[in-house]
Amino acid sequence: MALKLGVIGTGAIGQDHIRRCSKTLVGSQVVAVTDINLEQAANVVRDLGIGAEVYADGHALIAAPDVEAVLVCSWGPSHEEYVLAAIAAGKPVFCEKPLAVTAEGCRHIVEAEIASGRRLVQVGFMRPYDQGYRALKSVIDSGQIGEPLMLHCAHRNPRVGENYKTDMAITDTLIHELNVLRWLLNDDYVSVQVVFPRKSGKALAHMKDPQIVMLETARGTRIDVEVFVNCQYGYDIQCEVVGESGIARLPEPSQVQLRREAKLSNAILMDWKDRFIAAYDVELQDFIDGVKAGTIYGPSAWDGYAAAVAADACVLAQNNGAVVPITLAMRPAFYA
């Protein structure tokens, strides 16, 4: 029997998730949608031909008797409110990042979920579902390269919009690395420093770009992440793990290698959605299957909280240039 989903937010990512849950994935049916722009929500329902009911707001959708699970894809500052409402209603909820816009908000969600007595929350960090990252983690976990000593990473975007600010390099961009590298190493961060190289002439006047984020983990692994959101040439994600006895690199996306006019070339993707489209499918299928089986295994509210704590420290490090401690409480047994 199909899991009946309600989707809050019909912007770009909400529409993508409605489409994949209705047309691509198995075992789900979108029966309810809402958006701050109700006309847009109605248009999405009509254009996709899904026959879902449009609700006045997120709380009405969560309370609807036929909604069995909720997808929160709305504006970031609204996430905490809707996730807490879903937990209070006892309904599983998939929340796009951020889980909340503050670490304190994430902690409220963690506390509410623990009080509920069962896992209800999955956070929309899709990189742990990417085939390349999974292969890289398999190599690390197997011990083939020994203990990881250093990671060299990069997160590059061709360009960003006028509303993009320097701190968004952490809260919107690096946040994915903060999640996936912690998962990759099965280790928590203990400190961070951010430095700014020479500013790119392609960067917006009001922001600093690129920047280098240097993290240390509890087991002593050192990580450097280059964040360069105006690189021009493409969307490029890199991750190299230097171990005691070998090096492992994140594989490039599968592309045709072209030999032509005395040149050997490979295309580079320009859109992040193309780079991780398969991972989005896998993560939502995992949520659907987990809810139906009674156990959610995807990125947890605690993972969302850990990323938020690290992000807060990174933003502080942006501003003061110092090595900033990252202090995370002990993981509750609930999330073991």
Swiss-Prot record:
InterPro entries in UniProt: Gfo-Idh-MocA_inositol_DH (IPR050424), Gfo/Idh/MocA-like_OxRdtase_C (IPR004104), Gfo/Idh/MocA-like_OxRdtase_N (IPR000683), MI/DCI_dehydrogenase (IPR023794), NAD(P)-bd_dom_sf (IPR036291)
Pfam family for this entry, one: GFO_IDH_MocA_C
Catalytic class of the enzyme: oxidoreductase
GO biological process: inositol catabolic process
Alphabetically ordered keywords of this record: NAD, Oxidoreductase
UniProt GO MF annotations: inositol 2-dehydrogenase (NAD+) activity; nucleotide binding
Gene3D superfamilies referenced in this protein's UniProt entry, alphabetically: Dihydrodipicolinate Reductase, domain 2, NAD(P)-binding Rossmann-like Domain
Transmembrane segment boundaries: none
UniProt-listed Enzyme Commission number(s): 1.1.1.18
SUPFAM superfamilies: Glyceraldehyde-3-phosphate dehydrogenase-like, C-terminal domain (SSF55347), NAD(P)-binding Rossmann-fold domains (SSF51735)
Domain of life: Bacteria
Catalytic reaction(s) noted: myo-inositol + NAD(+) = scyllo-inosose + NADH + H(+)
PANTHER family referenced in this protein's UniProt entry, alphabetically: INOSITOL 2-DEHYDROGENASE, PTHR43593
Family per record: Belongs to the Gfo/Idh/MocA family.
Function: Involved in the oxidation of myo-inositol (MI) to 2-keto-myo-inositol (2KMI or 2-inosose).
Subunit structure and binding partners: Homotetramer.
Protein name in UniProt: Inositol 2-dehydrogenase
Organism name: Pseudomonas syringae pv. tomato (strain ATCC BAA-871 / DC3000)
Gene: iolG
